[in-house]
Structure formats: C-alpha cells, structure tokens
Amino acid sequence: MPSVGNMKLFSLSTDNPGPLPPAPAAQSIASAVNNVAVSDDSNPGAGDFDGSGNSYSAGALAKYGITAGGKVTVEGAQLTFPSQSPGTANAVASQGQTLSVDDSGHKITLLTASNDGDILGFLRVNYTDGTSEQFPIEVADWFSSNPAPGGSLVASTAWNQRPGNNSPHAVGLYGLTVDTGASNAKTIASITLPSDGRLKVFSAAVH
C-alpha cells in the first residue's frame, strides 16, 4: 500500500482505471516556473503567489536558510530552491505540467503550498519504462501555516503584501513526500502535476 508521509491510503477507490496515456514531455522546474511566489522586501508589489498580490518574503525565508539556488532539507531529501531572483517567476503554478526529477529512489518529496484552500489531487509518477502511476496528495493553504495530513511545515514566515495593505500574517511552506513503495524496482523519470493552479511547487527530488 503506498503512503503519503505517515498517512496510509486505504479506500479512495476500488476501481482500476486502466493504463494511463503517455506522459507529456518533461521539462525542468527551472524552465517551468510561471509564478512570482517570492518577492524582495524592498519591492513586495512584484510578487503574486496567491492571485491577490501577496507573496513570500525573501528576507523571512532566508532566516530559515531558504535562499535562491540554495539547498533545503525537506523530509530527509535535499531539494534545491529555485535560483531565480525574488520578484521574478520562481515557482510552478500547477497546470498539469510534467517535471523531470533527478536521482534515484522510491520516494518523491515536494516543497510546496497552495492558496485559497487546501488542494486534493493526484500526482502522476512516470517511470523510465513508459508506465505511470497516480498517487493522491493533499497540500495545505499557505495562509494556515498548518500542514495537511502526511505533510510537514518547512517554514512559517511573515508574508509580503501588495502595496497599500497592512495586515501582518504568517504563511506556511510545506514538505510532502509520496512513497511509491520500497519494493518498487522501477526508475522514476518525471512527475505530472494536477491541473489546479492554486497548487505551487518550488522543488522536487527523488530519494
């Protein structure tokens, strides 16, 4: 039985959906970024993580050791934070993209968050032999700073608001690990994200 973090998945469906269609061509996270999720404190108006002009504070994230191009340890995996500068596109808003992943192993860890509510969806895992599997995921709203079941809180920081707003609040950044099974001998080539733009992905790694 696959698991997400420590959450066991028992009865979402008893139906066999059959084989999935071929996965779309994969791209790197660096080439897929399309959301300005992190802004510099000197120019908060450049960010828009949530569609309302709010974003993560680069200065606040740096206090957790999270910086552009830096390494972040998340649930036992070494992830690389996007190298793009604050105030430029530096996260992937999920639109069904297929993202390449490096390294080997049977677990995939994401650095992620959502806006306007928690996300329930499926992460498609694509293997080098051409087959794929789907695994249910749940990602919490950044506004809560409270990870979804099976996830972890990586950082909870003050946000940057659009100019003219003055409502200080802490927002969360989360880790989420999908385990394809220790007995899985297949090699993971890529992942395909759900088609829900509220979900943002900063990094992903296989381990």
Where are these regions (language model features)?
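N-terminal/edge-of-domain interface segments
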Residues: 1-207
